[in-house]
Each structure stands twice: as structure tokens, then as C-alpha cells.
From Swiss-Prot:
NCBIfam families for this protein: glyS
GO BP annotation list: arginyl-tRNA aminoacylation; glycyl-tRNA aminoacylation
Family: Belongs to the class-II aminoacyl-tRNA synthetase family.
Organism ancestry: Bacteria, Bacillati, Bacillota, Bacilli, Lactobacillales
Quaternary state and interactors: Tetramer of two alpha and two beta subunits.
Database matches in InterPro entries: DALR_anticod-bd, Gly-tRNA-synth_bsu, Gly-tRNA-synth_heterodimer
Originating gene: glyS
Keyword presence, Nucleotidyltransferase: no
One Pfam family hit: tRNA_synt_2f
Intracellular or extracellular location(s): Cytoplasm
Protein's name according to its UniProt entry: Glycine--tRNA ligase beta subunit
Amino acid sequence: MTKNLLVELGLEELPAYVVTPSEKQLGEKMAAFLKGKRLSFEAIQTFSTPRRLAVRVTGLADKQSDLTEDFKGPAKKIALDSDGNFTKAAQGFVRGKGLTVEDIEFREIKGEEYVYVTKEEIGQAVEAIVPGIVDVLKSLTFPVSMHWAGNSFEYIRPVHTLTVLLDEQEFDLDFLDIKGSRVSRGHRFLGQETKIQSALSYEEDLRKQFVIADPCEREQMIVDQIKEIEAKHGVRIEIDADLLNEVLNLVEYPTAFMGSFDAKYLEVPEEVLVTSMKEHQRYFVVRDQDGKLLPNFISVRNGNAERLKNVIKGNEKVLVARLEDGEFFWREDQKLVISDLVEKLNNVTFHEKIGSLREHMIRTGQITVLLAEKASLSVDETVDLARAAAIYKFDLLTGMVGEFDELQGIMGEKYTLLAGETPAVAAAIREHYMPTSAEGELPESKVGAVLAIADKLDTILSFFSVGLIPSGSNDPYALRRATQGVVRILDAFGWHIAMDELIDSLYALKFDSLTYENKAEVMDFIKARVDKMMGSTPKDIKEAVLAGSNFVVADMLEAASALVEVSKEEDFKPSVESLSRAFNLAEKAEGVATVDSALFENDQEKALAEAVETLILSGPASQQLKQLFALSPVIDAFFENTMVMAEDQAVRQNRLAILSQLTKKAAKFACFNQINTK
């Protein structure tokens, strides 16, 4: 016979961003707890609102499964003395298992007998296991936590109720000074405290108190209500997934409605309006069927439709205040002079150990000069890049960005266009922030891409130079994201810029305000981002490519893909093993690897030396790999007929030189001795 278990934790309002991860974590930890306790179940369903986290287990076994375990002990010759009595070794072994020597039996393994005991544990009733659920609740982790009312234990928010039901049976467990009961809280304004009758009546009991416990149901309610508004008014409403997820975690009983604002505010840039609505007020944006922004918005109330007109008016009033600010800053910022703002950046600190934002811009500008050549920009693009680099942070001192910091770069583009700058300069100012997340949008223009790389590189190198290096999960200056952005942009544009050579060039630049250091750490940091971009590529292949001598990002990613592609083919293992053997021996070469044909003693030496001399890796990675694998028979013949480590030192070094030249060329693809072929 199976049972159904419900656990609900009632809390003060949770931050919206914490709700979904905490709900998921509760479900996962409950499943792990039950499995660890040998309690089978059919399904687990989780619930969450801003004021509760809950989990229901259905089809839960009414008792633990019995456990039978065999334990191997000492050999019989050690377990028995000369008189046939059990020794202290045998007695200690069984005592440690909670058994006696009478439980011992002997079993033969490979011709020798050993002590064995069998321990049986009868499963307990589920009721005896339920109290352990408190440990599950205590084990939940949160990005932020607090303690209250003299409690030393920290939690995400103060706990108000705990409900643990096994079907209809109530458990009065203690958790953070709260005693469990079947009482739960309804909606803060529309509902009352209510008793949950059983584990299976949970949703309906709360629904009567205006709480929709299932987040999927709340989400569908919001979407359906928005679709109804769309159909009624003939508009298009942007249902942003992130905003939807945030809103559903702000409400327990959602009611969507449409509000409006004066059309005069549409003269303000659309990005300002959208930011005001979406980022600051958590409103959904409304457009006409052609995609044009309308003076309307969609909000979701935490409650029903009663007195909705008053709610709409209140939301409109709050939004208008934000739009008034936006309109004011838009008007006033146009009176500012870009060059004046750039000069004032001398007084804005980039970081106290690094200097001002203006100094950061100057260094970035010098880096763009270097990158422009490597990226083969045209004359016009180079001119636009220089101008963009000279002013690209100016909008940080505008009123609009001061009020809406999400618009940095975006407003820079708009203000530069109004000031008569070229579209390329304006676009680069917007694009230099890209990507803003791990999978974020990349710059579209070459000028913007180069400026983005330069800005990020100076940021990375500057922080490394003063010892502000990310450690563990701690990365307060988002240097990992910046590095990932550099790597992604280089790959997307297919620029064959070797990162090691680029970093060398940057270290050669002499900045008055800052001296770059920690080159090795920087290179390892960049390699770690390339490693991440390789995704699920096997670890040994990643290591082989990252250990190679070619540090062009696009080439490295292509090489890893090519190796994965052919790793299942028949000739992969023998070809890699041949090259790997060459790599291992080449490490023994001394000095400059020059080959003297006069020292050849067999045709196989000559054949390999000639093959290496004519080897020029070219074309896509798959073609280069074929070129290298084609050498496998020549390498094998060389090893079969040649004693590389000959007694004659000159001959030995000559043969090592052949292998050294081979591996130097092959290492431009990968270090093959890093690949596991076993």
C-alpha cells in the first residue's frame, strides 16, 4: 500500500529570483533523501509561490525496503587459531557489524576461504522516517540568508509555518522554533489561514484562499490572460520569458490588466520606455500588429479583478513618473558636449588601484590600433574605430544613464548620432558592451567587435596586473564574462589572431599609468574560457588542443571538433599513438633541432625527414588532421627500423631532431601525446 506525502514551508516574501531555484532544489533533495532511506515512490511534484515552498510525493512506499548486505572479513587462517577458535580479528570484525561469531560463515574465493557475515535490516514504517525531513529543509542553500528572533541558524527568510502530512496524518515536527501543523496561509489580502486536509487536497485547499500553488498553472493563467487582452484590443504583447518567470514569482493569484500612458512619451527613445516598463516596473510591452510601440503596458496584479480600475490608475501614475524622468534626461542630455564629458571621465574612477575611466579609454585606444591591423580593417573602419575609442564611455556621465544604467552604450549610440558622428562610430559605442552574458548577442560590425575586444582585454589585463584575479566562484569584476566575450567575438569573426602573440604585443606597450604583469596567469585564464567553449568535448582532446602551439581561437575550436569527429574511426587510435610516440621522444631533443642528412643510416630516416620537411598544414582542420594521420605509416616504419636513442650522440640528436621538427609542426594542431587511446 502506498501513501502520499506533503511538505510545505511557509515563509516571508522571497526574492523572485530565488523562488524557482529553491523549489527545484527542494524537489531534488527530497528525492535524494527518500532514495537514501530506501523509500520508493512514483512521482514528486514541487510547488512554490513568493511565500511558500512545497513538495508532494505520490505513490510513496509505506515502509522501507528490507536490506540484506554481505560483508567479507579476514581469511579463515587468520580468523581461526590453532585450536579452531575465533581469533580477536574475527571477533572484532563481526562486532563492528553488530553481529556475533555465530553469524560467521566461510566462503571460498580463488582457492582460499574467507569470513563472511550477512546482515539483514528490516525496513521501518514510513512514519518513522518522516521526521528526517527536517534535515532536508535545513540542507537547502540560498544565495543570501538571514537570521532572526535570536536564531543562530540562517535561512533565506523567516519561517512562519510548516506543514507535513502523510495522507491525512499530521506531523508536528519542529523547525526553527516553528511547530508543524496542517495550518497554511492563504493570500496575504484575499485569503485566510486554512487547514490542509490531506496531501492530495493541497492545491484545492489553497485555491479557496486565492493561492495558486503550482507555478506552471500561474504561468499559464498569466499567458492566457495576456492572450485575451491581445485578442480584445488587437495588439501584440511581448511575453519575455525572463520577465514572465519573474512576475509569476511575485504573485500568488495573478490577474493581468492593460494600462496606458500619454502618447507624447513615445517621442523618447523606445529603449528608454521599454527599460522603464520592463526593468523597473515589471510591465510587458505592447505593440501594434506592425511592431510599433504603443502607449500601453501589461501588468500582473497579485490578486483578483476587484477594484481593478484603481489598481490600473495606480500603476499608470507610477509609470508616468518614470517616463517623466526619461523625457527630462533625454531633453537635457542633448545639451551636453561629448568632448566635455570625455574630459570629465578623468575624475571618474575605473578602480582605485588602476586609475580613471579616461586612462582605461586611452589604453583601450592604443590596443585598438594594434587590433585594427590584425583584423585587417579598412582605412574608413580604422578611422571610425579611432574616433569611437576616443569617446566611447562618455554616456556614463549623462543623466539618462545615471538614472537607467541598463542603457549605457545604447544612449551613447543615440547621442553620438545626434551630435553628427558616423553610424559606424555610434554602433561601435553600443556594441562594445557585447556580449553582456555568456550567450548574449555579439557585435555585428567589425569596428564594434574590435572596440569590444580592446575594452575587455584592457579590463582583464589591468585587474590581473594589480592582483585582482578571480578565484573559485568569486569574480566581482566579471573578468570571466569579459574573457568569454573576447573568445566568442574572435571565433564569430573568424579572425586569425593568435592570443599568445597578441598578449605579447600588449605587454610590449608601455603605458604610463599601468604596467601589465602576470602574463602566464592571463594566458591560463583565457585558455580556461576556450576550454569552456569546447563544451562536451572529451577532456583529453581539450587538453591536447590547449597544449598546442596554435592559439588562434577559431583554429583551436575547429581542431577539437575535428578530433572528436574522427575519434571513432578505425585509423584514429594507431595514428594518434604514432604521433604520441613522436611527441614523447621529441622532448629528449637538445638545443636547436637541425637535421643533417649525412647522418642518416636507413631509408626510413630519410623518408620521415623528407615527409616532415614538405609538411605544410593547410586548409580546414579536418584536412590538416588527414595530413598528419597520413604520416602514421612513415612514422611507424621509422620506429620499426631505427633505434632513436642510438649510442652515437650525433646520430641520436639527429633522429630526435627529425621528431622535434615533426612535433613542432603537429603541435600547431594539437599535442597528440595528451590524447588517451586506451
